[in-house]
UniProtKB/Swiss-Prot annotation:
Region (Disordered): 1-29
Keyword Metal-binding: yes
Domain of life: Eukaryota
ZnF bounds (SWIM-type): 134-171
Listed InterPro entries: Znf_SWIM (IPR007527), ZSWIM4-8_C (IPR048370)
Native source organism of the sequence: Mus musculus (Mouse)
Name of the protein: Zinc finger SWIM domain-containing protein 4
Length: 1101
């Protein structure tokens, strides 16, 4: 690798001096050119050791050029790169505040003594506050700030605004800064008297601070054997760093650790995750600048991540960490891969990092790559290997080692950059085959067209190299390697297609295939497809405005614009087209769904991220051609493509990718777009695994057993499948051929009733725009989908069934009377009887529906006849719940009403309950049909049985209503119902209540009625005498029953009961004699209950 490129300063140090333009036009003096190079690379101590005497002008130029010259580096160490809330405009970023202080003239008394810069910063206070004065000092060496000190109390990750202001002043106004040699050089020019005067004045000026230290040092110097006298020379803080000192930018390690710890403790908040991601971005920024602090900062962050107390808790519970935390760990692992793979790090640095990673990897709390701690979950891999027939692979999988988030980085430690072919690829855009062919390797190094390929390692590892090169500031080398990898993929695809053509007939006959890659590229821990796409897209990005020092801090992110950039050595190729090609290649790869909830979530998230990248690219004619070509290859890719004719049962579905391709291709090639999307509608994991021709006893059980516990994201996948179908239906509006093709695919592949219902609603909404006539074909498809939902959910009631049924009726209404009558005629395969009679028939015949259908009289009568037929059929199938609604619907048609009434009568003989019969009887009375009400009431009484102790039976009110109805109809009806009452009711209070009601005037007969002279019925004549005898007998039976197990606390209730019994006994002509005989019988029978009998005598004598 070439050495790091020299940084260019944003502005000339002499930029504010007069005559700057004239100086810029002249060549730079050789002294300055030499001093610049020395100042960048050599410590000043090394210069002094190399040359016995360095002239003062040379020393001054070296010291002058040793201060950092790039504002971008100052910005890197004074801004985290987060996006501030809207309206703040970066006021919290130290770099912005420091720039404002500089521009407002707040920097004063700047002095550079050797490699030490100092100055004062005056900052205006808030309202009513005095001006603040801060003293800032900066040490630097070899164009890097090595330490900072400021009087403010701001504690942040990076430099404060005052340090920024002083640094920017030194960069922009370098020649206005007073420059002195290191203080040791000045002291060496003084004689004894001058030195004594210097020391005394220094002590006098700062006696309160330095006097104790000065006295201690004086005592040690005067002591001959002291340690200070044994050391040659004296320290000079202004003389720069020594030869052995580390040369790196100042980084407050303690503050970084504290900040990460605090952010992790607030891990549930969105802002904490954003700030940690910003810190990761800062690490990448440092790596790109080839700053050694990138690795230092990553080590500090990793240590704090591993000390997160939640890790131990999650491990103890055997649970997975939160999604936000998991994503942060993924980013941490990816950064370590970039650091370990660094192409310019020293071997001892890499060894130290690998040792650290090895230690962390062995920790119990170190997160595993799949996202969870050790949980016993069913493994997919044995199933995969059994299908592919590879026993060796199964054994390897079963014995797979524990993989943590650092495993990939540890594996990267085994890689190197000294492969000769790899070096040739990275070195030149015009790398071509030589006479030696394969460069002495067994693997080919060029494709048949002479383009370099890279087969040295697995595809994800090769892509990690691309990401590493890009992360470390080698964008051109990253692009060269990315192109070689794409050439390799193309060559492999050609070989795969040739292999598939030979096996195509066999695979199609078999109807199944094994998965070709158990470790997919999308959702892979190394994100290979994302690495390639970002590297290629970055080369095509248009910079419409000057590059900002901190691009992420803009209040609103602009949509990125891309342009075609030609690939050197490949005419007609562009990086933008390659990015699109490789993204589609990765998204369309057939791959097995990984294990674990997080791994599956990651597949979905990674797919969405890649598609978001592609959606930023505006498609032109060249890219559309790439889309067409790749879509065709995906359709013909066989087992290597997720769009192939035959796919593995548990491969990742292509719905999301297909939706993007469909939308992109539709304006240019509708036929290809529909063929691709229809092919992607499959979700084979929901299909039963039984051989063709054998039906499963319960298909739902088969589906559920296949769903769990592995397919954690199945709900999400089904939703994406529904969205793809909805997009196709909307696009196919007006095209009968494709509409029916989409309908067939939906009916075959979508198995969720809820999603089918949503799809039907969407289709109906699309088919009935407010400002245009409806699309009848699409409406018919919406209705067909609704009918399928009804059939699927007929025997599995859901809380949304009523909503679905109502919607189906409204959809059929939109189509017209034939559709509405069709669902009424075929109701038995779609609805329950209750749904059909209470929702379908009622909604279909409302006034609003009739107006909507705009039917004439004959059409209305036909619809009513259909509804009445439905009602009668429902009443016959479920009279218990449908009889009354059927009668209501048939009110206006005498024949239908009579038929419904007859169904009720027949059902009464077949066991229709008394409660339903009473309900229908009351309805008949309300309709003015008392005789029919009476008939139904007698049928209900015949089924009723009320025991002696059921005073509060639910049917009490119905019985009293039936008695009142019979009383109002006349003596004949009353005489007929009395035997039923006596046979069905054995409750004495209830019988006496009925008896008293019948002794009053008949209800409904006013004083002017035709029977106003009729006398009230007497209890001494039939039919009431029979009821009186039954009531008396019931009281006698109930009394004996209660006395059998009576307790003293119920004596009072029993006395009240006897009081009511006496009232009933007295209704008979000889009632007091019967009651007296009854009491005497009680006294003789229960003479052992002396207290109770005493109470009876006291009350009744």
């Amino acid at each position: 690798m070439e050495p790091p490129a020299a940084k260019r300063s944003r502005g000339c140090p002499a930029g504010d001096e007069p005559g700057t333009g004239a100086r810029r036009s002249r060549p730079e003096p050789l002294l300055d050119l030499s001093a610049k190079r020395v100042a960048e690379s050599w410590a000043f101590e090394q210069v002094e050791e190399r040359f016995s005497r360095v002239p003062e002008p040379v020393q001054k130029r070296i010291v002058f050029w040793s201060f950092p010259r790039s504002e971008r580096e100052i910005c890197m160490y004074s801004s985290l790169g987060y996006q501030p809330p809207e309206g703040e405009q970066d006021t919290r970023v130290p770099f912005t505040r420091g720039l404002h202080l500089l521009q407002s003239g707040a920097v004063d008394r700047v002095l550079q003594v050797g490699f030490h810069l100092s100055g004062n910063i005056r900052e205006v206070g808030g309202p009513g506050e005095p001006e603040h004065l801060y003293h800032v000092s900066i040490s630097f060496d070899r164009c890097k700030i090595t330490s900072v000190s400021c009087g403010c109390d701001n504690r942040d990750l990076f430099y404060c605004a005052h340090v920024v202001a002083l640094s920017l002043y030194r960069i922009r106004h370098a020649r206005q800064v007073e420059l002195r040699l290191p203080i040791s050089e000045t002291l060496s020019q003084m004689n004894r008297d001058q030195l004594q005067k210097f020391v005394q004045y220094l002590i006098s000026a700062h006696h309160t601070e330095v006097l104790p230290t000065a006295q201690r040092l004086a005592d040690e110097i005067l002591l001959l054997g002291s340690e200070i006298n044994l050391v040659h020379g004296a320290p000079d803080p202004t003389a720069g760093a020594g030869t052995e000192d580390a040369n790196c930018w100042h980084l407050d390690e303690e503050q970084i650790q504290e900040q990460v710890k605090q952010l992790l403790s607030n891990g549930g908040h969105y802002g904490a995750s954003q700030q940690l991601r910003s810190m990761f971005s800062k690490v990448r920024e440092m790596l790109r600048a080839r700053d050694s602090n990138g690795a230092r900062m990553l080590i500090l962050m990793t240590e704090q991540f591993l000390q997160d107390p939640r890790l131990a808790l999650w491990r103890q519970q055997g649970a997975g960490m939160t999604d936000k935390c998991r994503q942060l760990w993924d980013e941490l692992g990816a950064l370590w891969v970039c650091v370990i793979l660094s192409p310019h790090c020293k071997p001892d640095e890499r060894s130290g990092w690998l040792q650290l990673l090895g230690t962390w990897d062995k920790l119990d709390v170190c997160p595993l790559e799949e996202g969870n701690y050790s949980l016993d979950i069913p493994s997919l891999q044995p199933a995969l290997t059994s299908r592919t027939g590879s026993e060796d692979e199964e054994e390897v999988t079963a014995a797979s080692p524990r993989r943590t988030v650092f495993s990939r980085a540890l594996q990267a430690g085994e890689l190197h950059w000294n492969d000769s072919h790899l070096q040739r690829i990275l070195a030149s855009d015009s790398c071509g085959p030589t006479l030696t062919g394969s460069m002495g390797s067994d693997k080919p190094t060029f494709d048949p067209q002479g383009h370099p390929i890279w087969l040295g390692e697995p595809f994800p590892t090769a892509c990690a190299r691309v990401d590493t090169l890009r992360a470390h500031g080698y964008p051109h080398k990253a692009l060269r390697l990315a192109c070689a990898i794409i050439n390799t993929l193309r060559l492999q695809r050609r070989h795969q297609l040739e292999s598939y053509k030979q096996q195509k007939k066999e695979l199609l006959q078999k109807g199944a295939t094994g998965v070709t890659s158990t470790e997919g590229w999308v959702g892979h821990p190394l994100d290979p497809i994302g690495c390639l796409c970002r590297a290629l897209l970055e080369a095509c990005r248009l910079e419409e405005e000057p590059h900002s020092l901190f691009p992420d801090s803009a209040p609103e992110k602009r949509k990125l614009a891309y342009q075609h950039v030609l690939v050197p050595g490949s005419p007609g190729e562009s990086y933008l087209a390659l990015a699109l090609e490789v993204a589609l290649l990765g998204l369309g790869q057939q791959r097995a769904l990984p294990e674990g909830l997080y791994a599956q979530d990651k597949v979905v998230r990674n797919e969405e991220q890649l598609l978001a990248l592609l959606e930023e690219v505006e498609l032109d004619e060249r890219l559309v051609q790439v889309l067409r070509k790749q879509a065709g290859l995906l359709l013909e890719g066989g087992p290597f493509s997720g769009f192939g004719e035959v796919i593995f049962r548990e491969s990742v579905p292509m719905h999301t990718c297909a939706r993007y391709l469909f939308t992109a291709l539709l304006p240019h090639d509708p036929d290809l777009a529909f063929r691709l999307a229809l092919r992607a509608m499959r979700l084979p994991v929901l299909e039963t695994t039984f051989p063709a021709g054998e039906s499963h006893p319960n298909p739902l059980d088969s589906i559920m057993s296949n769903r769990f516990p592995r397919w954690f994201i199945l709900g999400h996948l089904e939703t994406r499948q529904c969205e793809l179908a909805s997009t196709m239906l909307t696009a196919a509006k007006g095209d009968t051929k494709w509409l029916h093709a989409v309908l067939g695919s939906v009916q075959q592949n979508i198995h969720s009733p809820a999603l089918l219902f949503k799809l039907a609603q969407d289709a109906c909404k699309t088919a009935t725009p407010a400002s245009a006539p409806p699309d009848t074909v699409l409406l018919g498809i919406a209705l067909e989908l609704g009918l399928q939902v009804m059939r699927m959910t007929l025997n599995t009631m859901t809380w949304r069934r009523r909503e679905m049924v109502r919607w189906l009726v409204s959809c059929a209404t939109e189509i017209g009377p034939p559709a509405l009558m069709s669902i009424m005629k075929n109701w038995y395969s779609l609805f329950t009887p209750v749904e059909a009679v209470t929702i379908v028939a009622v909604t279909g015949t409302t006034h609003a529906t009739l107006l909507r259908l705009q039917l004439d009289t004959a059409g209305r009568e036909e619809l009513w006849a259909c509804a009445r037929t439905l009602a009668l059929q429902c009443a016959m199938k479920d009279p218990q719940n449908c009889a009354l609604p059927a009668l209501t619907l048939c009110e206006k048609n005498h024949a239908a009403f009579e038929a419904a009434y007859q169904i009720v009568l027949d059902a009464a003989a077949g066991g229709l309950g008394h409660a339903h019969l009473f309900t229908v009887a009351r309805y008949m009375e309300h309709r003015g049909l008392p005789l029919r009400a009476y008939k139904l009431a007698t049928l209900a009484l015949a089924q009723l049985s009320i025991a002696f102790n059921q005073d509060s039976h639910p049917a009490v009110n119905d019985v009293l209503w039936a008695c009142s109805l019979s009383h109002s109809l006349g003596r004949h009806e009353l005489s007929a119902i009395v035997p039923l009452i006596i046979r069905s009711i054995h409750c004495a209070p209830m019988l006496s209540d009925i008896l008293r009601r019948w002794t009053l005037s008949a209800p409904g007969l006013g004083p002017l009625g035709a029977r106003r002279a009729t006398k009230p019925l007497g209890t001494d004549r039939a039919p009431l005498c029979q009821l009186l005898d039954a009531a008396v007998a019931a009281y006698i039976t109930t009394s004996h029953s209660r006395l059998t197990h009576i307790s003293p606390r119920h004596y009072g209730d029993f006395i009240e009961f006897l009081g009511k019994a006496r009232e009933t006994f007295l209704l008979a002509p000889d009632g007091h004699l019967q009651f007296a005989q009854f009491l005497e019988n009680l006294k003789q029978t229960y003479k052992g209950k002396k207290k109770l009998m005493l109470l009876v005598r006291e009350r009744f004598g």
